[in-house]
Amino acid sequence: MRSAAKPWSPVAKAGSHGPDRTRPLPGTPSGMKSSKSSTSLAFESRLSKLKRASSEDTLNKPGSASSGVARLKKTSTSGAISELTESRLRSNTGTIPTTKRTGIPAPRELSVTISRERSVPRGPSSSKKLGSSPTSSCNPTPTKHLRTTPAKPKQEHEGAEKAVLESQVRELLAEAKTKDSEINRLRSELKKCKERWALSTEDANASDPSAEGTASPESDAQPLIRTLEEKNKTFQKELADLEEENRALKEKLTYLEQSPNSEGAASHTGDSSCPTSITHESSFGSPVGNELSSETDEYRRTTHGSALRTSGSSSSDVTKASLSPDASDFEHITADTPSRPLSATSNPFKSSKGSPTGSSPNNASELSLASLTEKIQKMEENQHSTAEELQATLQELSDQQQMVQELTAENEKLVDEKTILETSFHQHRERAEQLSQENEKLINLLQERVKNEEPSAQGGKVLELEQKCTDILEKSRFEREKLLNIQQQLTCSLRKVEEENQGAIDMIKHLKEENEKLNGFLEHERCNNSVMAKTLEECRVTLEGLKMENGSLKALLEADKQKAIEASSTVGQTAENFEVQEMLKVARAEKDQLQLSCTELRQELLKANGEIKHVSSLLAKMEKDYSYLKEVCDHQAEQLSRTSLKLQEKASESDAEIKDMKETIFELEDQVEQHRAVKLHNNQLISELEGSVIKLEEQKSDLERQLKTLTKQIKEETEEWRRFQADLQTAVVVANDIKCEAQQELRTVKRRLLEEEEKNARLQKELGDIQGHSRWVTGRATLLPVNEEPEPSEADAAGRWRGVYVNRTSPAPSDSATTVKSLIKSFDLGHSGGTGQSISVHKTPRSPLSGIPVRTAPAAAVSPMQRHSTYSSMKPASKGTSQRLDLPDLPLSDLLKGRAEDRKSDPYLRKSPSLESLSRPPSLGFGNTRLLSASTGGLKPSKLSVERRDPLAALAREYGGSKRNALLKWCQKKTEGYANIDITNFSSSWSDGLALCALLHTYLPAHIPYQELNSQEKKRNLLLAFEAAQSVGINPSLELSEMLYTDRPDWQSVMQYVAQIYKYFET
């Protein structure tokens, strides 16, 4: 749909299906009211009816009665996707700061809008500014923010086919847009000609010379035609440049899709086609954009400076976050209304009463910038929450895949065990049958014998058997008592033998000590004996020496005696004899001394011999004693060892006898108990086997059911892909029809221009004929068409515009819901069977460039992004702001307004609208099919059960969906009723600490004064929460510095900490 010309300023609108998007509004050229002839109005109305009829025939589906806005959601979503990739591709140029790429869709940047004006060549006699055609300004509808999944390698071929089809559609739309712009330009030129002709007739009547009056229109018409031809050529050149640029962007897109790091880019395939359509819109969408590229560049440089690098023909410098022009093209082509002159009512920033004095452009720009910043923050918040949700679902999917693998391995093991147990069960059953048959045979034989025997004999036998039993019992008791007495005697004898053994051991120890003492004394005596033998040998040597000396002395004595005899014979000698006598005296004295010493030595020798004899006798005695003692000790040791061995043998024999008797006593009882235990064990095994067989059959049925659902989903997705291809083909056909219509309109308008030029020449000739009349007649004749013609045209246009305005602002909610449902019918397979689910507005969109639909977890039927968008759309309604800023451009605004007014009574309902929209738990989806099937089947959890590995599995089964979404819903439910708490993710919602304090306040109100807290004191809030949790034994796994200095802490660590709180208080 098209509205009147509006100032170029980014205005954020609250959409009903996604986050808020920014859009550029066309600029307001300075001008005044221009009139339209009744013929042009009739022609335009007929032309719009034809377009509307053709578009409704090709695009309307049965049951949809909404306007063209709701019928063309697919092209709008494809354009929105194409924008995001182009903004990613151009994020490195430096004009706008980019965000950190994480492989998931990044939040959208602030849109940069450019106001444009064009200088129109005027004739010398034109003194008024020209008005712009309102049909050239387009008002795009809000599109959905898509959460696209990364494209898989299987679907690259399908994505390429989609991209080709969409590029064809956009090229056709661009061509139709160029034709439409040419039609609008020709209309404006026609209006200019009429105005100039009216002014020239007035000037000609005022000043009588007719030559100047007739020459001016002719001189003005020729340069106009030339300028039109030149502009047409320039537009064709620009169109060729844009086509080349579009081809280059397509090559970039295919390169990005084929690159290995295309996970982030594949989720936004098709974005590269956005600049072409945006550039077409900026070049051809309105007469403001019809100027030459050089004039546009100069004006942009002077207006915006070096911050905005713009170009008239380059698509790389167009605004990044503007909405997709494809949806607006379809709208203003299929639901075009006749253009009307500019009026004060077309200002979107007027008050609700429609006063002619609207708000100033500065206030409008400030309002738009404030709303843009707010919406961009919300978009970033939603983007991070979706990224967090995607990562959590991916982790849980990988865990579930591992669990499936483990369960399949365990299932195989169970199957093997089942086969083994079945074989053993069959063997036991056969054995039991054989035993039962034998038992029956024996019973039959016993019954036959009983029948054959007489009753008296039977009674005697019974008495004999009873007597035998009593005798056996008495014997067994007597033997038992005997055995007990024997056991007591043996124990007593064993104790005595042990005491004797202990005494013998002590005696042996004492004898060993005495033996050691005697050995020491013997060694000492031996040492003394060796010393005495040495001294004896020395004495013997000295005795031999003395004997030799004695012999020599005897020989000397004999010699001296002979000399004395000779001397005595010679008595009469002289003094010599005297000397000999003295010498004899000396010799005699020495002889006496030697004799004394010899006698002493003989006495000592005798003493030494006596001592030697005495010591040898003692030594012999000691040796005899030692040998005797040794023999006695050895004999005693042998006796003690023999006695100990005998005692040990007796004790072992007695123990063996006791054990044998005990074993014989309790043997039968053990056998009976073993038999009973084996029987019970076999019965338990049989029951367990039957239970495992039932479990395996139920698991098999569950797996078959899952396989059927998956095959059904695949079939429905393929059918939906075929439907989408058919829709694209119909869109191509419609675009071709529109192109043909635009070409026909162009030819008709050119024909009308020639007719008007001929009529203008004819009127100029008539003007020369009636120049002789008076001035008041000519003035009245010229004023009548000027003053009377605008009234019906303005009234008609205003009436039509009001009709279009009402049609835009108040669509039927059921129609919009059914249209959205028809577009995304195959994406809610998990919810199709539920009659109690009423999710009509919050539908999950799908990407037209991805082969599989965008699916969320079954429990998270309303994602945090959609909740945020719903809250952002409900908030203005509850505060009572002006509805003129939101309603004219939103096809589902009335529906959201009604939902917001219904929920206004509950102030805390806006925290979790998904809980209200779901009336019962969702049906089976892809993530929780195995868990729900296991719980409905009534099976006991196995050793790989989710509850054992993670207590959050029970919470996920209670709330449905993934563990992350279940824990998030639990947090929302626990903190419901607390002020300033809005939990939508596990990152930014917990950064100020209020959410943690509120969650812990529900369990520990004495530890946390929640009424005194505010969101500005982050450190206090976090310290209070950590201390309260630590007081009950929950260790703080979060870092205080990370929580304080980052607005978005790590969501996994926050989720782990919240899970610890849940496990402590809830499990």
Swiss-Prot record:
Subcellular compartments? Nucleus
Q: Where is the composition biased (Polar residues)?
A: 90-101, 256-285, 336-349, 866-884
Q: Which SMART domains match?
A: CH
One Pfam family in the UniProt entry: CH
Positions carrying Phosphoserine are 38, 55, 76, 111, 133, 136-137, 360, 365, 368, 424, 847, 863, 912, 914
Which segments constitute the Calponin-homology (CH) domain?
961-1066
* Superkingdom: Eukaryota
Q: Which GO terms describe its biological process?
A: associative learning; blastocyst development
Q: Which UniProt keywords apply?
A: Coiled coil, Lipoprotein, Membrane, Myristate, Nucleus, Phosphoprotein
Compositional bias (Low complexity) at which positions?
28-40, 123-143, 350-363, 912-922
Q: Where is this region: Disordered?
A: 1-163, 192-223, 250-375, 831-922
Coiled coil ranges (UniProt) are: 574-773
- Per the record, where are the segments of Basic and acidic residues compositional bias? 153-163, 896-909
Task: Please list the residues that carry the modification Phosphothreonine.
Answer: T77, T141, T357
The entry's cellular-component GO terms read: apical part of cell; cytoplasm; cytosol; fibrillar center; membrane; nucleoplasm; nucleus
Q: Which family does it belong to?
A: Belongs to the cytospin-A family.
Identification of the protein by name: Cytospin-B
Species name: Mus musculus
* Gene name of the record: Specc1
